[in-house]
From Swiss-Prot:
This is Phosphoribosylaminoimidazole-succinocarboxamide synthase. The lineage of its organism: Bacteria, Pseudomonadati, Pseudomonadota, Gammaproteobacteria, Pasteurellales. It catalyses: 5-amino-1-(5-phospho-D-ribosyl)imidazole-4-carboxylate + L-aspartate + ATP = (2S)-2-[5-amino-1-(5-phospho-beta-D-ribosyl)imidazole-4-carboxamido]succinate + ADP + phosphate + 2 H(+). Disulfide bonds: none annotated. GO terms for cellular component: cytoplasm. Belongs to the SAICAR synthetase family. Pfam families: SAICAR_synt. HAMAP family: SAICAR_synth. It comes from Haemophilus influenzae (strain PittGG).
Length: 290
């Protein structure tokens, strides 16, 4: 059964794959991370216990760590400033009061290693999103430098589509595209260097950006979590293999092997797969923040 978050006195204005948004006023909203899990763009019936709390802690850690690179969606307000105590107590570890921003209509993906849809593109064309890459790269090869590979932002339930940088410029304008690319690569580079010291390789990640009321580019949503990124362990990494990741890969692999057709409804995921997934999320938090 899909996890239901507590009913709050604030008005719900959006329900996404993982997060629900509530209106506070015209400048702020409350973002609440559920324990829902999506795989192949379908939301699973079975929640992953404590996932929303772990994701929120990882995101908050990175928002603070990367604040010197660019502004973020934090307002400085506590959930207790905007909700009655009995409601705030229920969601305090999975909720953030954030600025209302105008989201930029692309997925800002940065890749430092070759895998996933990028590997498929490379095998077919020698490029990713129109960017030429060296010959001879294999699964999990480290790229010569981090690359910005945007995709279109599709509605929930539709697959995002990789686009070229020129298409990105058409969608959001050349000036904004240049800012987004520069900031996304800077964020990834700093985070990846830090994570390596903690035994984690950040293979790739997706950033979400918005514009504030003054048109300032602002980092929003979630940052460098196992949901928005592929984390690999330094200990098990080897180019030419598909390294295990700190995320929903257990669930994805189980679903891939289950014969499921990737349409709702989703088959029931075994308890041991769910527990392994919780453990991996927790391990990522522990490694990054200790």
């Amino acid at each position: 059964m899909t996890q239901q978050l507590p009913i709050l006195s604030l008005k719900k204005i959006y329900s996404g794959k993982v997060r629900d948004l509530y209106e506070i006023d015209d400048k702020r909203m409350l973002m609440v991370a559920s324990d829902r899990l999506s795989a192949f763009d379908v939301i699973l019936d079975d929640p992953i216990p404590r996932k929303g709390e772990i994701l929120t802690q990882i995101s908050n850690f990175w928002f603070n760590k990367l604040a010197h690179i660019m502004p973020n969606h934090f307002t400085g307000d506590s959930v207790y400033d905007v909700l009655p105590k009995e409601e705030a107590d229920l969601i305090r570890d999975r909720a953030v009061v954030c600025k209302r921003l105008n989201p930029i209509k692309i997925e800002s993906i940065v890749r430092g290693y070759l895998t996933g849809s990028g590997l498929k593109d490379y095998k077919q064309t020698g490029t990713i999103c129109g960017l030429k890459l060296p010959e001879g790269l294999v699964e999990a090869s480290k790229l010569p430098e981090a690359i910005f590979t945007p995709s279109s932002k599709e509605e929930v339930g539709n697959h995002d589509i990789n686009i070229s940088y020129a298409e990105c410029e058409k969608l959001i304008g050349a000036d904004l595209a240049a800012q987004v690319k520069e900031k996304a690569i800077a964020l990834y580079t700093v985070a990846a260097e830090y994570a390596l010291t903690k035994g984690i390789i950040i293979c790739d990640t997706k950033f979400e950006f918005g514009l504030d009321e003054n048109g300032t580019l602002t980092l929003m949503d979630e940052v460098l979590t196992p949901d928005s990124s592929r984390f690999w362990s330094v200990d098990t990494y080897q180019a030419g293999t598909n390294p295990p990741s700190f995320d929903k890969q257990f669930v994805r692999d189980w679903l891939e092997n289950s014969g499921w057709n990737k349409q709702a409804p989703v088959p029931k995921v075994p308890e041991n797969i769910i527990q392994k997934t919780v453990d991996k999320y927790q391990e990522a938090l522990d490694l990054l923040t200790k």
